[in-house]
Protein backbone atom coordinates (compact mmCIF):
# COMPACT_ATOMS: atom_id res chain seq x y z
CA UNK A 1 0.00 0.00 0.00
CA UNK A 2 1.40 3.37 -1.00
CA UNK A 3 1.97 5.83 1.81
CA UNK A 4 -0.22 8.60 0.45
CA UNK A 5 -3.92 9.27 0.43
CA UNK A 6 -6.09 8.42 -2.57
CA UNK A 7 -6.93 11.02 -5.18
CA UNK A 8 -10.61 10.39 -4.40
CA UNK A 9 -10.04 11.58 -0.85
CA UNK A 10 -7.99 14.53 -2.08
CA UNK A 11 -10.66 15.66 -4.51
CA UNK A 12 -13.33 15.37 -1.82
CA UNK A 13 -11.21 17.51 0.49
CA UNK A 14 -10.68 20.10 -2.21
CA UNK A 15 -14.36 20.23 -3.12
CA UNK A 16 -15.12 20.94 0.52
CA UNK A 17 -12.39 23.53 0.84
CA UNK A 18 -10.35 25.30 -1.80
CA UNK A 19 -12.37 23.92 -4.70
CA UNK A 20 -11.72 21.45 -7.49
CA UNK A 21 -9.98 24.12 -9.57
CA UNK A 22 -6.98 23.74 -7.25
CA UNK A 23 -6.19 20.31 -8.73
CA UNK A 24 -6.37 19.18 -12.35
CA UNK A 25 -5.79 15.58 -13.40
CA UNK A 26 -3.80 14.60 -16.47
CA UNK A 27 -1.31 16.23 -18.82
CA UNK A 28 -0.58 15.70 -22.50
CA UNK A 29 1.56 12.82 -23.73
CA UNK A 30 4.06 15.32 -25.12
CA UNK A 31 4.46 17.21 -21.85
CA UNK A 32 4.75 13.96 -19.91
CA UNK A 33 7.41 12.59 -22.29
CA UNK A 34 9.40 15.80 -21.96
CA UNK A 35 9.23 15.73 -18.17
CA UNK A 36 10.46 12.12 -18.10
CA UNK A 37 13.32 12.98 -20.45
CA UNK A 38 14.46 15.78 -18.15
CA UNK A 39 14.12 13.49 -15.13
CA UNK A 40 16.45 11.05 -16.90
CA UNK A 41 19.09 13.74 -17.33
CA UNK A 42 18.69 14.97 -13.75
CA UNK A 43 19.03 11.46 -12.29
CA UNK A 44 21.98 10.70 -14.61
CA UNK A 45 23.82 13.71 -13.18
CA UNK A 46 24.53 11.63 -10.07
CA UNK A 47 26.63 9.25 -12.19
CA UNK A 48 28.48 11.41 -14.71
CA UNK A 49 25.57 11.58 -17.15
CA UNK A 50 25.16 7.84 -17.62
CA UNK A 51 22.70 6.69 -20.29
CA UNK A 52 21.55 10.10 -21.46
CA UNK A 53 20.18 10.38 -25.01
CA UNK A 54 22.86 10.04 -27.68
CA UNK A 55 21.82 13.35 -29.25
CA UNK A 56 23.13 15.22 -26.20
CA UNK A 57 26.79 16.22 -25.91
CA UNK A 58 28.68 17.96 -23.11
CA UNK A 59 29.75 21.54 -23.70
CA UNK A 60 31.45 21.93 -20.32
CA UNK A 61 31.62 20.84 -16.69
CA UNK A 62 30.49 22.91 -13.72
CA UNK A 63 32.34 22.22 -10.47
CA UNK A 64 33.48 23.94 -7.30
CA UNK A 65 35.63 21.99 -4.84
CA UNK A 66 34.65 24.03 -1.76
CA UNK A 67 30.90 23.57 -2.18
CA UNK A 68 31.00 20.35 -4.24
CA UNK A 69 28.42 21.78 -6.61
CA UNK A 70 28.47 19.64 -9.75
CA UNK A 71 26.78 20.16 -13.07
CA UNK A 72 27.13 20.34 -16.81
CA UNK A 73 26.18 22.56 -19.68
CA UNK A 74 25.00 20.28 -22.48
CA UNK A 75 23.84 20.75 -26.03
CA UNK A 76 21.12 18.87 -27.87
CA UNK A 77 21.44 19.72 -31.56
CA UNK A 78 18.40 17.62 -32.46
CA UNK A 79 16.19 19.89 -30.35
CA UNK A 80 18.31 23.03 -30.67
CA UNK A 81 18.68 23.34 -26.91
CA UNK A 82 21.39 24.32 -24.46
CA UNK A 83 20.76 22.32 -21.29
CA UNK A 84 22.17 23.09 -17.84
CA UNK A 85 21.85 20.28 -15.30
CA UNK A 86 22.89 20.21 -11.64
CA UNK A 87 23.58 17.11 -9.57
CA UNK A 88 21.72 16.74 -6.31
CA UNK A 89 23.23 16.06 -2.89
CA UNK A 90 26.20 13.74 -3.22
CA UNK A 91 28.47 14.50 -0.25
CA UNK A 92 28.65 15.75 3.32
CA UNK A 93 29.70 19.11 1.90
CA UNK A 94 26.45 19.26 -0.05
CA UNK A 95 24.54 18.23 3.06
CA UNK A 96 25.94 21.25 4.89
CA UNK A 97 24.48 23.44 2.16
CA UNK A 98 21.14 21.60 2.38
CA UNK A 99 20.77 22.32 6.09
CA UNK A 100 21.74 26.00 5.96
CA UNK A 101 18.19 27.37 6.08
CA UNK A 102 19.22 30.96 6.79
CA UNK A 103 17.80 33.05 3.98
CA UNK A 104 20.22 35.13 1.92
CA UNK A 105 19.30 38.26 -0.04
CA UNK A 106 19.34 37.46 -3.77
CA UNK A 107 21.90 40.21 -4.35
CA UNK A 108 23.09 38.91 -7.72
CA UNK A 109 19.60 39.58 -9.13
CA UNK A 110 18.68 43.15 -8.10
CA UNK A 111 15.62 42.98 -10.38
CA UNK A 112 14.14 40.57 -7.84
CA UNK A 113 13.10 43.18 -5.28
CA UNK A 114 12.91 41.89 -1.71
CA UNK A 115 13.91 38.40 -2.80
CA UNK A 116 15.72 36.05 -0.45
CA UNK A 117 16.75 32.48 -1.19
CA UNK A 118 17.97 29.41 0.69
CA UNK A 119 21.29 30.41 2.24
CA UNK A 120 23.13 27.17 1.52
CA UNK A 121 22.03 27.06 -2.10
CA UNK A 122 22.93 30.70 -2.57
CA UNK A 123 26.46 29.90 -1.38
CA UNK A 124 26.44 27.10 -3.94
CA UNK A 125 25.22 29.45 -6.66
CA UNK A 126 27.87 32.08 -5.92
CA UNK A 127 30.55 29.38 -6.10
CA UNK A 128 29.68 28.44 -9.69
CA UNK A 129 27.94 31.56 -11.03
CA UNK A 130 30.83 32.66 -13.25
CA UNK A 131 31.28 29.16 -14.66
CA UNK A 132 27.60 28.75 -15.47
CA UNK A 133 27.18 32.17 -17.02
CA UNK A 134 30.38 31.78 -19.03
CA UNK A 135 29.51 28.36 -20.43
CA UNK A 136 25.93 29.32 -21.25
CA UNK A 137 27.04 32.57 -22.90
CA UNK A 138 29.63 30.70 -24.95
CA UNK A 139 27.06 28.24 -26.23
CA UNK A 140 24.36 30.87 -26.75
CA UNK A 141 26.78 32.96 -28.82
CA UNK A 142 27.64 29.99 -31.02
CA UNK A 143 24.04 28.81 -31.28
CA UNK A 144 21.87 31.94 -31.04
CA UNK A 145 18.72 30.14 -32.20
CA UNK A 146 18.91 27.53 -29.44
CA UNK A 147 16.65 27.77 -26.40
CA UNK A 148 17.82 27.22 -22.82
CA UNK A 149 16.68 24.38 -20.57
CA UNK A 150 17.67 24.10 -16.90
CA UNK A 151 17.04 21.03 -14.76
CA UNK A 152 18.06 19.21 -11.59
CA UNK A 153 16.90 16.98 -8.74
CA UNK A 154 16.85 17.79 -5.00
CA UNK A 155 19.70 20.22 -4.23
CA UNK A 156 20.19 20.30 -7.99
CA UNK A 157 16.56 21.35 -8.39
CA UNK A 158 17.02 24.41 -6.20
CA UNK A 159 20.27 25.20 -8.00
CA UNK A 160 18.37 24.98 -11.28
CA UNK A 161 15.64 27.30 -9.99
CA UNK A 162 18.11 29.93 -8.75
CA UNK A 163 20.11 29.68 -11.97
CA UNK A 164 16.99 30.10 -14.08
CA UNK A 165 15.93 33.18 -12.14
CA UNK A 166 19.40 34.66 -12.54
CA UNK A 167 19.68 33.91 -16.26
CA UNK A 168 16.19 35.28 -16.89
CA UNK A 169 17.72 38.75 -16.60
CA UNK A 170 19.72 38.01 -19.77
CA UNK A 171 17.75 35.37 -21.69
CA UNK A 172 14.03 35.14 -22.37
CA UNK A 173 13.84 31.62 -23.83
CA UNK A 174 14.33 29.50 -20.70
CA UNK A 175 12.34 26.43 -19.66
CA UNK A 176 12.92 24.81 -16.27
CA UNK A 177 12.24 21.27 -14.99
CA UNK A 178 12.89 20.50 -11.33
CA UNK A 179 12.36 17.23 -9.46
CA UNK A 180 11.96 16.95 -5.69
CA UNK A 181 12.77 20.64 -5.28
CA UNK A 182 12.97 21.97 -1.72
CA UNK A 183 11.38 25.32 -1.00
CA UNK A 184 13.99 27.67 -2.43
CA UNK A 185 13.08 31.18 -1.33
CA UNK A 186 10.69 33.64 0.26
CA UNK A 187 7.38 34.96 -1.05
CA UNK A 188 9.02 37.72 -3.10
CA UNK A 189 11.27 35.17 -4.79
CA UNK A 190 8.37 32.78 -5.44
CA UNK A 191 6.32 35.61 -6.93
CA UNK A 192 9.23 36.63 -9.16
CA UNK A 193 9.57 33.08 -10.48
CA UNK A 194 5.81 32.79 -10.97
CA UNK A 195 5.69 36.01 -12.99
CA UNK A 196 8.89 35.45 -14.98
CA UNK A 197 8.06 31.88 -16.02
CA UNK A 198 4.24 32.14 -15.91
CA UNK A 199 4.52 29.32 -13.41
CA UNK A 200 0.92 29.53 -12.21
CA UNK A 201 -0.50 29.22 -15.74
CA UNK A 202 -0.33 25.58 -16.90
CA UNK A 203 -1.18 26.61 -20.47
CA UNK A 204 1.82 28.93 -20.75
CA UNK A 205 4.26 27.90 -18.02
CA UNK A 206 7.98 27.62 -18.62
CA UNK A 207 8.60 26.11 -15.16
CA UNK A 208 7.68 22.52 -14.32
CA UNK A 209 8.12 21.82 -10.59
CA UNK A 210 7.67 18.04 -10.44
CA UNK A 211 7.05 16.06 -7.25
CA UNK A 212 6.47 12.34 -6.60
CA UNK A 213 3.91 10.70 -4.28
CA UNK A 214 5.03 11.51 -0.70
CA UNK A 215 8.53 12.86 -1.42
CA UNK A 216 9.58 14.48 1.85
CA UNK A 217 12.06 17.03 0.52
CA UNK A 218 9.49 19.47 -0.95
CA UNK A 219 8.30 19.95 2.65
CA UNK A 220 11.66 21.53 3.49
CA UNK A 221 12.64 24.12 4.58
CA UNK A 222 9.46 24.69 6.61
CA UNK A 223 7.08 27.52 5.84
CA UNK A 224 7.54 28.65 9.45
CA UNK A 225 10.98 29.89 8.41
CA UNK A 226 9.57 32.07 5.66
CA UNK A 227 9.92 29.68 2.73
CA UNK A 228 7.30 29.42 -0.01
CA UNK A 229 7.08 27.19 -3.08
CA UNK A 230 6.65 28.84 -6.45
CA UNK A 231 4.29 27.93 -9.21
CA UNK A 232 2.12 25.01 -10.15
CA UNK A 233 3.23 21.62 -8.82
CA UNK A 234 3.24 18.67 -11.22
CA UNK A 235 2.55 15.78 -8.86
CA UNK A 236 3.29 12.27 -10.13
CA UNK A 237 1.52 9.33 -8.51
CA UNK A 238 1.80 5.65 -9.40
CA UNK A 239 1.45 3.89 -11.76
CA UNK A 240 3.37 6.45 -13.78
CA UNK A 241 1.73 7.98 -16.82
CA UNK A 242 0.30 11.25 -18.13
CA UNK A 243 -3.10 10.57 -16.57
CA UNK A 244 -1.50 10.11 -13.16
CA UNK A 245 0.05 13.56 -13.17
CA UNK A 246 -1.86 16.17 -11.18
CA UNK A 247 -1.46 19.93 -11.52
CA UNK A 248 -1.71 21.44 -8.06
CA UNK A 249 -1.97 25.20 -7.65
CA UNK A 250 -0.21 26.91 -4.79
CA UNK A 251 2.09 25.66 -2.07
CA UNK A 252 -0.06 23.84 0.44
CA UNK A 253 -2.90 22.19 -1.47
CA UNK A 254 -3.46 18.49 -0.90
CA UNK A 255 -0.74 17.09 -3.15
CA UNK A 256 2.83 16.03 -2.39
CA UNK A 257 3.39 18.32 0.59
CA UNK A 258 0.26 17.00 2.31
CA UNK A 259 1.22 13.31 2.17
CA UNK A 260 3.30 13.19 5.35
CA UNK A 261 6.65 12.44 3.71
CA UNK A 262 9.70 13.41 5.73
CA UNK A 263 13.16 14.12 4.36
CA UNK A 264 14.92 11.78 1.97
CA UNK A 265 12.63 8.79 1.39
CA UNK A 266 12.06 6.29 -1.41
CA UNK A 267 9.76 8.69 -3.21
CA UNK A 268 12.49 11.31 -3.25
CA UNK A 269 15.31 9.24 -4.70
CA UNK A 270 13.17 7.58 -7.40
CA UNK A 271 11.32 9.53 -10.08
CA UNK A 272 9.42 7.78 -12.88
CA UNK A 273 11.03 4.49 -11.87
CA UNK A 274 14.56 5.93 -12.12
CA UNK A 275 16.70 5.98 -8.98
CA UNK A 276 19.29 8.71 -8.59
CA UNK A 277 22.49 7.58 -10.30
CA UNK A 278 21.37 3.96 -10.69
CA UNK A 279 21.64 4.09 -14.51
CA UNK A 280 19.30 1.13 -14.96
CA UNK A 281 16.91 2.84 -17.37
Curated annotation (Swiss-Prot):
Disulfide bonds join 50-279, 112-115, 248-255. Residues 1-21 form the signal peptide. Keywords: Carbohydrate metabolism, Disulfide bond, Glycoprotein, Hydrolase, Polysaccharide degradation, Secreted, Serine esterase, Signal, Xylan degradation. It comes from the Eukaryota. It is found in: Secreted. One of its GO terms (cellular component) is extracellular region. InterPro entries: AB_hydrolase_fold, AB_hydrolase_lip/est, Fungal_lipase-type. Pfam families: Lipase_3. Belongs to the AB hydrolase superfamily. FaeA family. This is Probable feruloyl esterase A.
